[in-house]
Regions:
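Flexible, low-complexity junctional segments that flank or bridge functional domains
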Residues: 32-271, 286, 451-482
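Short intrinsically disordered, low-complexity coil segments enriched in acidic
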Residues: 1-2, 356
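Bacterial N-terminal signal peptides that target proteins for export
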Residues: 3-19
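Alpha-helical structural motif
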Residues: 16-18, 61, 427-432
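P-loop NTPase catalytic core of nucleic-acid-dependent motor ATPases
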Residues: 274
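C-terminal "post-core" interaction segments
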Residues: 237-244, 248-271, 279-482
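N-terminal signal peptide c-region/cleavage motif recognized by signal peptidases
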Residues: 27-30
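Short, hydrophobic/amphipathic alpha-helical patches that form generic packing surfaces
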Residues: 24, 63-71, 433-437
């Protein structure tokens, strides 16, 4: 995809470098023009980093955070007039600075402090230490496996999405999930620390209503960006539907996306179900690639999206353009399966495709993250500031989806539940079945069900706090990764 600055064009290498700085994620997780504008941006970022205090204490870290925020924060003219001396940590000071934007939903924790190592590991590959599954809470506060990562320890032990966790052995014998929840057991107690070799026993109810007992150990794993393989869903008398379950916009997702698009193109698929229900976003460069693959043939060289900075940094506003790849598909209709865990880069892709092709949402409304962050590193320290620095609009300069894409009134949403008890592509799974129905009938079911968010992100006195309010770094809202 080509990137222009004030009508100019950047090389693919420069775009790749910019992508390292730009992040689009909900987090605990964007004919050739002169490159001098881009070089100016990189130089400015380098100067800003090198000119800040190098000491790593909280006092100077707060000064550094304030300096960067006043210069680069998207709404820098709305920062709260607070005294850094009133706050014990730089994160607390940052929260206070951005409180006016948190209150109205524009920045509810999207700006945060982390470390360079944690940040880079999260958004280059998504690697972490764990069992290799994501859990979610369903009806009656039951705990289900929402997703199991291929080739991870849980997958190798036979665990699959839809299995219900009945009991956990934390080292002192099995205890029921209900008992663990009622006594407020912590996440670390139930699933153990993020340490290689940590073992837990699980008793689960499988898809045949039989009890499966397994003991598994944590390992370092890198969840595949695409769940299983791209699939063709047969339809009697019609061309098949292409199904893709896309987990995360990490650097490791580029080749799988290209391969999936090539597969669909060779099969002549025109109707698609793109499952983004747990995709909280990621890197701008991967959103770039996905848009080219999905929309490059429809809108080659037309504007795809626009990054808008604050008035002080307006020189760095940038348009992106669709570009046709040899693997780009020829779509007629897209159904995107979404939840409140669908955010940021996922929303960018949907919003940018909408002016060019028929798009419908199935599930529940999206998160509403219409902004992206740059990464700022404190010199000589391990601190990295992820700061909301630009707003994301589509090629027609339409955005503003701070309460979700459907809430803008510009998208059709067919209400459906995320049925944690069934596999993703089970025709009886409500979201998948509704998506197929829309492609068949061209309309939402006549009597849509009442959709509620997963219990794990609603209030419930029966659940421990860590399930009610999962840290943003763990991915999709309401679904814990273990």
């Amino acid at each position: 995809m080509m990137t222009t600055w004030s009508g100019g064009k950047l090389s693919s290498q420069k775009l790749k470098e910019l992508a390292v700085c730009a992040l689009l994620a909900v987090s605990a997780q964007s004919a050739a023009a002169p490159a001098d504008q881009f070089t100016k941006l990189l130089s400015t970022l380098d100067e800003l980093r090198s000119s800040q205090p190098s000491a790593c204490g909280e006092t100077l870290r707060k000064e550094w955070v304030g300096s960067v925020a006043r210069d680069w924060y998207l709404w820098n003219d709305e920062l709260a007039p607070v005294d850094p001396a009133d706050y014990s940590t730089a994160q607390a000071y940052l929260n206070a600075l951005t409180e006016p934007l948190a209150a109205d939903g524009r920045d509810p924790g999207f700006s945060y402090l982390t470390t360079r190592q944690l940040d880079e590991s999260q958004y280059t590959s998504g690697a972490y230490i764990g069992f290799g599954f994501r859990s979610g809470v369903g009806p009656e506060d039951a705990l289900f496996l929402a997703d199991v990562f291929e080739s991870g320890p849980a997958w190798e032990a036979g665990l699959r999405r839809g299995m219900r966790v009945l009991e956990v052995d934390t080292g002192a014998g099995f205890e029921t999930w209900q008992s663990l929840a009622e006594r407020g057991a912590t996440s670390s107690e139930v699933f153990g620390p993020a340490v290689l070799g940590t073992q837990r026993g699980f008793r689960l109810l499988d898809h045949d209503d039989e009890v499966l007992e397994v003991y598994i150990k944590k390992d370092e794993l890198d969840p595949p960006a695409i769940a299983s393989e791209p699939m063709l869903i047969d339809r009697p008398g019609r061309d098949p539907v292409g199904y893709l379950n896309f987990r995360q916009f990490t650097l490791s997702a580029r080749l799988p996306l290209i391969n999936a698009s090539r597969f669909f193109r060779e099969e002549g698929v025109t109707d698609y179900i793109i499952d983004l229900r747990y995709n909280g976003g990621g890197l701008l460069s991967i959103a770039d690639v996905m848009l080219d693959l999905l929309g490059g043939n429809l809108a080659d060289r037309q504007r795809s999206f626009f990054l808008s900075h604050n008035n002080w940094r307006a020189d760095y506003n940038v348009y992106e353009y669709f570009e046709r790849f040899t693997e780009s598909i020829e779509p007629l209709r897209f159904v995107f399966i979404t939840t409140r865990g669908t955010a940021s880069a996922s929303e960018l892709v949907i919003n940018s495709l909408a002016p060019h092709v028929e798009v419908v949402l199935v599930g529940s409304d999206t998160r509403g993250k219409a902004v992206g962050q740059y990464a700022f590193d404190q010199p000589g320290c391990d601190a990295r500031l992820r700061l909301v620095s630009f707003e994301i609009l589509n090629g027609e300069e339409v955005g503003g989806y701070y309460t979700g894409l459907a809430d803008t009134g510009r998208f059709t949403l067919c209400a459906a539940a995320d049925d944690l008890s069934r596999p993703f592509t089970d025709p009886e799974e409500d979201s998948f079945g509704t998506a197929l129905s829309w492609l068949e009938e061209g309309s939402c079911p006549s009597q849509p069900i009442s959709v509620e968010p997963p219990r794990s992100w609603r209030r419930s006195s029966a659940l421990p706090a860590w399930l009610l309010h999962p840290p943003k770094a763990l991915g999709a809202i309401g679904y814990r990764r273990h």
